[in-house]
């Protein structure tokens, strides 16, 4: 059965950590399964106010007791991996083992690579991502202490834009795939079949889809989604987010 999460951008009126923590607490109480945040340091117009997702996640961890939490997605190429290792372990401890780390290449179109002196070339960012994931695993395994609550590692979801295949191959080495730009459930079903063929039988692997508020999650769950997250876009009214959270998730019978 698919699990259901809330997925918000900490922008504008949602850039305030106390507001995000309050929304996360309401999500926890309303029966949702996860609360995830976009990870950006800047964004294209008309967005101006961008909250730090990692400080926000610390507040979220303290405000909740049940839901999974995490960034979706962190471009590792613009981060110092040893710092991410400390942040993720600390969040995993703070949340008692509820962190999932979403990673990907990120997108230069939002103005958060070259303007800040970061690598923009996609091939170089891909190399840095792969190396960063290997380094994270090494740090989590005990090279740096403390170690995460979750063992053998904090779950890693890898994002990639449909129909590119390289992110899919990368994701299959980790714990889940967050494909963006899917044309429909049939495309997700293809990815689910690919995952079943490539992974050992019975080994957990998440397929995550993001849907706008109100879209029927049933076809996506039937196609193989293990997580359906409600994505409000870059600047929703806080009232809309609260309304969806308070209504609770749509539970599916497959």
Per-range role (PLM):
Residues 1-254:
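Active-site-adjacent structural elements that line small-molecule/cofactor binding pockets in enzymes
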């Amino acid at each position: 059965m698919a699990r259901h999460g809330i997925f918000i951008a900490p922008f504008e009126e949602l850039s305030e950590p106390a507001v995000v923590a309050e929304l996360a607490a309401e999500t926890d109480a309303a029966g949702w399964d996860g609360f995830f945040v976009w990870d950006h340091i800047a964004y294209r117009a008309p967005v101006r106010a961008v909250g730090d997702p990692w400080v926000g996640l610390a507040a979220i961890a303290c405000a909740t007791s049940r839901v999974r939490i995490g960034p979706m997605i962190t471009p590792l190429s613009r981060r110092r991996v040893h710092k991410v290792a400390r942040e993720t372990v600390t969040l995993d401890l703070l949340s008692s083992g509820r962190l999932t780390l979403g990673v990907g290449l990120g997108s230069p179109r939002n103005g958060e690579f070259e303007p800040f002196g970061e690598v923009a070339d996609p091939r170089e960012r891909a190399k840095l991502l792969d190396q960063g994931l290997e380094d994270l695993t090494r740090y989590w395994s005990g090279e740096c202490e403390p170690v995460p609550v979750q063992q053998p590692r904090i779950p890693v979801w890898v994002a990639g834009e449909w129909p590119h295949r390289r992110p899919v191959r990368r994701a299959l080495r980790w714990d889940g795939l967050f494909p963006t730009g899917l044309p429909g459930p049939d495309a997700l079903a293809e990815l689910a079949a690919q995952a079943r063929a490539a992974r050992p039988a019975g080994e957990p692997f998440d397929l995550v889809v993001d849907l706008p508020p109100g879209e029927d999650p049933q076809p996506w769950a039937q196609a193989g989604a293990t997580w359906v997250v409600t994505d409000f876009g870059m600047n929703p009214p806080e009232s809309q987010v609260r309304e969806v959270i308070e209504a609770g998730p749509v539970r599916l019978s497959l």
